[in-house]
Structures are given as structure tokens and as C-alpha cells.
């Protein structure tokens, strides 16, 4: 694999890069051998109210998983992202907002963003929100989403951002689990010319009898669309901030005070509230942003991720703003109203650094040269990829067509739980191979292990674990530390298990091969198979369901659901549509099955366990080696499934 064509470091990058190959080696070695010294120094990327004396205090030991960084230091995230830039760079653009409609865009300076955040912080205080309270944010991609998040951090409230594509049921579940006191939303969102009924979804979520903690709903007027209104509970954003002062002293927070909860799909069905704290998280987000994107003051940076995902937290907002960068926030989609929209936005705003997902890249690649028609993209210097492994063909297309064969592609591997980049190239320090995330970031100690947890040396393939802590690591799952230990530290003792498999080549470059557990990666978004199965079996006509992922050209993985109906029920085109809509309503459009495979029975072991390995192979059409079927209670089921599969039209 090391024989694959290597992309060398372009001269224009090498000439002014922040980290060259020699510096990377020296800094990486220090970060591993002397983490207290290394991170003690790197922590100075932030302004601290009370400087830390302690740096690292962590344990991955069974029954005693505990992660603390900079634990005696105090700071405020919003002050680091806003206040400290005002004197020198108050007039610099903090956020460029590009609307779904290309005629709508605006520039918001650091001074203006600071003013808006102070006003909203005072609004939150007036509504009785205190340090430690949880605030749910269900917003479109508008600057006010950033204002809401930063205002929470400013007063010490914990934000729980919920992706605007989630259904009312999913929203309710997250509000209940986190005990949110306030919901911030918008009348509607806008995406690819369509309105998204955000306020209606919140109304429906709050009808759930188990939602008892919410006192108010603050509503931003985005479209002016007609919405229901509950007097006393619902409040207009503009009415509230109008009366609020633009002066606010940021709350002094301990480095280990909670900053946000972000729900991510688990393999057991119930979404997990990943909890990040303030100090270590922001040090890590800022440092990774600066070095991985080789950020120079004045660069225009665009991360296409929604604020509802961790990428939107770390690399649309907090990392860039902590570094005083100009970050572009895009309400629309990369290929609407024309396939060249992404390239047009790059030219319009003279973007230097572009960070997007393989799903978007593959969708544009399918359009060929229409994706770059009428654009030159000459402002670009660095390209990035996030969300799932990028296949070499898409990587090469991205490098060649979007980046004009001159921009390094930083293919970043990380997770909601890691807070920031883990395995990634550095533009001036790493020769690139299409499809490889390359080498670990500072302080990250990856290892590949076999099923027993034994480390594998040299060029090999195995489960990807991290053997020691890093500052951006999630501290726990909200309200469930036992599940945190069980999920990430019980498979392999004294190691963090990522749930991903990987290959390491002769150059010690890492190639991520995908999930090894029951989590799907659809368009760069994680979905638990158990969550989708629970939604399916909740349908009154469905007896049983098993969900697997199959390869998909655009989305990376498509959702393939095996469904057995209750006795007396018959499959029909109407039921097919009804079941797909049912899942869409229960979880959201992302979770809609691409294929429903009606069947009478599923392959089970004698103990009743569904053999997913076999279902994956059948769904993917890989029937050459189904492996050991001797433990099946009824081996004949497999033949029947193979026959049924012949008649199924597969998504392209």
C-alpha cells in the first residue's frame, strides 16, 4: 500500500507552513514522552483567568475512568472566542453568512458578534437560566445559532444543540434526557429552497408528556411563516434582545465545568449525550484548527458542517473563533440551485480553506465539470475532508477539480467523543496518500489491536484504539458514567476503543476502514442500527427488523432493512411507503431506509441472536463466503433470503 502515489508538499505551502516535517516529529515525540510539558505549553493558546498549575490527570483503568485537564485553571470560552480579539481585531469579520438564497449574505465583525452575544447572555439570565442549566438549541444555519451557543458558554449554561433534521420524537428524547430548561428555535429553517418547520417540530416535541423541564421557547423569526404560539411559554427572539444590555462580564468557569452535551447514535438504540468540558476542549479545538488548516491571520475559512454536529461546534465555530479567524456559515446545500454552488461560494467570498464531507464531494463528482462551471477557485490553499473515510477516487477528484491540483487535502479522522482531530495530515509536514488519514496529531497515541486487545505491530489491520488521553476527549456521557465506561473502555482494557477498524501501512500511515460495531455512517452522520430497528418495530404491522449498511456511491452507506411482518399482514407498495415515512417521522429523514427487504424470518443462532454478519453480506450481494452458518437455528433461512434478494431493486 505504501507504493501508492504520494502527493508531495507543494512549495507554496512548504515556504510558509506553521509546522514542517522535522518540527512535527520533534513536537509529536515531546507530546507523547512529556505530555505535561507539551500540553502545559500549548494551553497558552488560550487566555486564562486563573492560570493552571496541573495539566494532565487521567485514568483509563477499569472501574476508574477519569479524565481531567488543566483542572485548577479558570477561563471563559466566549471571552476567548470574542473579547480577547476586540482590541486588535474588533473590526475583522468573525462570521460571513451565506444564505440559502445566493442574494442573501452578510458579514458580522467580532465587535458586532460580541455585542449580540452579550445581549443574548443577558436575555438568558433574565429568563432565569443559571450556570449549569441545560439549554436546547434547534436552529437553522444562521448567525443567531452561533450567538445562542456562545451566550450559553458566556454565562456558564450547558448547550445541547439538536440537528435541525431531527424529528419531534428525537427532539423530545434529547430534551428529556438532558433536562433542558429552555429551547431556542426558529419559526422555520430554509434549505435548498424548501422551508423546514422547526417551531412546529418543537411544539410537537413539547407535547410529549415526559417533557416537564422546559419553561420557555425563544423563537427567531427567519421566514415569517405562520406558526402556532403559546402565550407565556413562547417568546420572540427580537423582543427579548431589544430590551437587553450589550454589556456582560463573562462568567469565570473552571476548566472542567461542562460546556456542551451533544447526542450521538449508539449501537444500543438510546442516543448518548456526549459531555465536553471547557478548558481542554477549547485548547484542543483551537490548536488542531490552527495547525491542521495551517491557519494564517486573514485566511477566509469555510466549514460546510451544520452546527448540530460536532464538526459545527469545533470547526465551524469554536476552533476558528478562538484563533480570531473569519469563518463562513452556509445555510444552503453544496449543489443547489446549481451543481456549481459550492465553487461559486468559494469564489464569491475568496475562501482560502475549504472543509467538507466525502458525501458532498461524491455528489459533486457525479455532476462532472458542471460542479466547477464558471468558477476558478484560485483563492483556495487548503482542502479538508471530514465525516467518514474518503475513497481515493473522490479524494483525487477533489484535489484535481476543486483544488486545481495545488491544494493539500487534509483527510481528518475524529469523532464526537474526541472533540477534535485525532489522525490527520498537517499541510506542511505530511506527504499525502489519497484515502489515508495519515499520522496522529500531537498527543494522540493510536494503536491497532486484535480481538483480544493484543497490540499489532508494523503494517497490519485491526481495531483502532487510543492508549492515552488527550485534552479534547469527552469526559463522560451525560448522567451515565457507567455507560461511558462500558461503551468506550470495556472492549479493550485501559484503552479508548473508537468503534472503527483501520489499516496501517509500511509508512505508518493509517487508513480508516469503517465502523466495526452496529453504527452506520450515512452521508457522514452516525446512526445506530438499533435506533432504526426500534423505530421499525414500533410500527403496528411489523414484528421484527434488522438493519445493516450497504455501500452507496454518494452517501457512503445506505440503509438496508430486513423486515418481518405480523401474522396476517401482507407486503404492498403502500405499506413500503408507509414504513419508510414512519421511520422518517420517528427519527428524521437521514434515517429513512433505502431498501426494505420483506421476509418471513431472520437468520438467528439457537440462542436467538440475529446473525448480522450474514445479513450484511446478503445485502451487499457478497455471497461468495457467508462464513460459518453452523450455529444457525434454521440454515434454510439463508437460502430464502438470497432468493428474495434477487428481486430487490438496489439504490444507485
Swiss-Prot record:
Mg(2+) binds at residues 537, 539, 542. It is an enzyme of class 6 (ligase). GO terms for molecular function: acetate-CoA ligase activity; AMP binding; ATP binding; metal ion binding. Its EC number is 6.2.1.1. Disulfide bonds: none annotated. InterPro entries: Ac_CoA_lig, ACAS_N, AMP-bd_C, AMP-bd_C_sf, AMP-binding_CS, AMP-dep_synth/lig_dom, ANL_N_sf. ATP binds at residues 387-389, 411-416, 500, 515, 526. GO terms for cellular component: cytosol. Acetylated. Deacetylation by the SIR2-homolog deacetylase activates the enzyme. Pfam families: ACAS_N (PF16177), AMP-binding (PF00501), AMP-binding_C (PF13193). Its cofactor is Mg(2+). CoA binds at residues 191-194, 311, 335, 523, 584. The modification N6-acetyllysine is found at residue 609. GO terms for biological process: acetyl-CoA biosynthetic process from acetate; chemotaxis. It catalyses: acetate + ATP + CoA = acetyl-CoA + AMP + diphosphate. Keywords: Acetylation, ATP-binding, Ligase, Magnesium, Metal-binding, Nucleotide-binding. Catalyzes the conversion of acetate into acetyl-CoA (AcCoA), an essential intermediate at the junction of anabolic and catabolic pathways. Acs undergoes a two-step reaction. In the first half reaction, Acs combines acetate with ATP to form acetyl-adenylate (AcAMP) intermediate. In the second half reaction, it can then transfer the acetyl group from AcAMP to the sulfhydryl group of CoA, forming the product AcCoA. Enables the cell to use acetate during aerobic growth to generate energy via the TCA cycle, and biosynthetic compounds via the glyoxylate shunt. Acetylates CheY, the response regulator involved in flagellar movement and chemotaxis. Belongs to the ATP-dependent AMP-binding enzyme family. NCBIfam families: Ac_CoA_lig_AcsA (TIGR02188), PRK00174.1 (NF001208). This is Acetyl-coenzyme A synthetase. It comes from Escherichia coli O157:H7.
Amino acid at each position: 500500500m505504501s507504493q501508492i502515489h504520494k502527493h508531495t508538499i507543494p512549495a507554496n505551502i512548504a515556504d510558509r507552513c506553521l509546522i514542517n516535517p522535522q518540527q512535527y516529529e520533534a513536537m509529536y515525540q515531546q507530546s507523547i514522552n512529556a505530555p505535561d510539558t507539551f500540553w502545559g505549553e500549548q494551553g497558552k493558546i488560550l487566555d486564562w483567568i486563573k492560570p493552571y498549575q496541573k495539566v494532565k490527570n487521567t485514568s483509563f483503568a477499569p472501574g476508574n475512568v477519569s479524565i481531567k485537564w488543566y483542572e485548577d485553571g479558570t477561563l471563559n470560552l466566549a471571552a476567548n472566542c470574542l473579547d480577547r480579539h476586540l482590541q486588535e481585531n474588533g473590526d475583522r469579520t468573525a462570521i460571513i453568512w451565506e444564505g440559502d438564497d445566493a442574494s442573501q449574505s452578510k458579514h458580522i465583525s467580532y465587535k458586532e458578534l460580541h455585542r449580540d452575544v452579550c445581549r443574548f447572555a443577558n436575555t438568558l439570565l433574565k429568563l432565569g437560566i443559571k450556570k449549569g442549566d441545560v439549554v436546547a438549541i434547534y436552529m437553522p444555519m444562521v448567525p443567531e445559532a452561533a450567538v445562542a451557543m456562545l451566550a450559553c458558554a458566556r454565562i456558564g449554561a450547558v448547550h445541547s444543540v439538536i440537528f435541525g433534521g431531527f424529528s419531534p420524537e428525537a427532539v423530545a428524547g434529547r430534551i428529556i434526557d438532558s433536562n433542558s430548561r429552555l429551547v431556542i428555535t426558529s419559526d422555520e429553517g430554509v434549505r435548498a429552497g424548501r422551508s423546514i418547520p422547526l417551531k412546529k417540530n418543537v411544539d410537537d416535541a413539547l407535547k410529549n408528556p415526559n417533557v416537564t423541564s422546559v419553561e420557555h421557547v425563544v423563537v427567531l423569526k427567519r421566514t415569517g411563516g405562520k406558526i402556532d404560539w403559546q402565550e407565556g411559554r413562547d417568546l420572540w427572539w427580537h423582543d427579548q434582545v431589544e430590551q437587553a444590555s450589550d454589556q456582560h462580564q463573562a462568567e469565570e468557569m473552571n476548566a472542567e465545568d461542562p460546556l456542551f452535551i451533544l447526542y450521538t447514535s449508539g449501537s444500543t438504540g438510546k442516543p448518548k449525550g456526549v459531555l465536553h468540558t471547557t478548558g481542554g476542549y477549547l485548547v484542543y479545538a483551537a490548536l488542531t484548527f490552527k495547525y491542521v488548516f495551517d491557519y494564517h491571520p486573514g485566511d477566509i475559512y469555510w466549514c460546510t458542517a451544520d452546527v448540530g454536529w460536532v464538526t459545527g461546534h469545533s470547526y465551524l465555530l469554536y476552533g476558528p473563533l478562538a484563533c480570531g479567524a473569519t469563518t463562513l456559515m452556509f445555510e444552503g446545500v453544496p449543489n443547489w440551485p446549481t451543481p456549481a454552488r459550492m465553487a461559486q461560494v468559494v469564489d464569491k467570498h475568496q475562501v482560502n480553506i475549504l472543509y467538507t464531507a466525502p458525501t458532498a464531494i461524491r455528489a459533486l463528482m457525479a455532476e462532472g465539470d458542471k460542479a466547477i462551471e464558471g468558477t476558478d477557485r484560485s483563492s483556495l490553499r487548503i482542502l479538508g475532508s471530514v465525516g467518514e473515510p474518503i475513497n481515493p477516487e473522490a479524494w483525487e477528484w477533489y484535489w484535481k477539480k476543486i483544488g486545481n491540483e495545488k491544494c493539500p487535502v487534509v483527510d481528518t479522522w475524529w469523532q464526537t467523543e474526541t472533540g477534535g482531530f485525532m489522525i490527520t495530515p498537517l499541510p506542511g509536514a505530511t506527504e499525502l496518500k489519497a484515502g489515508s488519514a495519515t499520522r496522529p496529531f500531537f498527543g494522540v497515541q493510536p494503536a491497532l489491536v486484535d480481538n483480544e486487545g493484543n497490540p499489532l505491530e508494523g503494517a497490519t489491520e485491526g481495531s483502532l484504539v487510543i492508549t492515552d488521553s488527550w485534552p479534547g476527549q469527552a469526559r463522560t456521557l451525560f448522567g451515565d458514567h457507567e455507560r461511558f465506561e462500558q461503551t468506550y473502555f470495556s472492549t479493550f482494557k485501559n484503552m479508548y476503543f473508537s468503534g472503527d477498524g483501520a489499516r496501517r501501512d509500511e509508512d505508518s500511515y493509517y487508513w480508516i476502514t469503517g465502523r466495526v460495531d452496529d453504527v452506520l455512517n450515512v452521508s457522514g452522520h452516525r446512526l445506530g442500527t438499533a435506533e432504526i430497528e426500534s423505530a421499525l418495530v414500533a410500527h403496528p404491522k411489523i414484528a421484527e427488523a434488522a438493519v445493516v449498511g450497504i455501500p452507496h456511491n454518494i452517501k457512503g452507506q445506505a440503509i438496508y432493512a430486513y423486515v418481518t411482518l405480523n401474522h396476517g399482514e401482507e407486503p404492498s407498495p403502500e405499506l413500503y411507503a408507509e414504513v419508510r415515512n414512519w421511520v422518517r417521522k420517528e427519527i428524521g429523514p437521514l434515517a429513512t431506509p433505502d431498501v426494505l427487504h420483506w421476509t418471513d424470518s431472520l437468520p438467528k443462532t439457537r440462542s436467538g441472536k440475529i446473525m448480522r454478519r450474514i445479513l450484511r453480506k446478503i445485502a451487499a450481494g457478497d455471497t461468495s463466503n457467508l462464513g460459518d452458518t453452523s450455529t444457525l437455528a434454521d440454515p434454510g433461512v439463508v437460502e430464502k433470503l438470497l432468493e428474495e434478494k434477487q428481486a430487490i431493486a438496489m439504490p444507485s
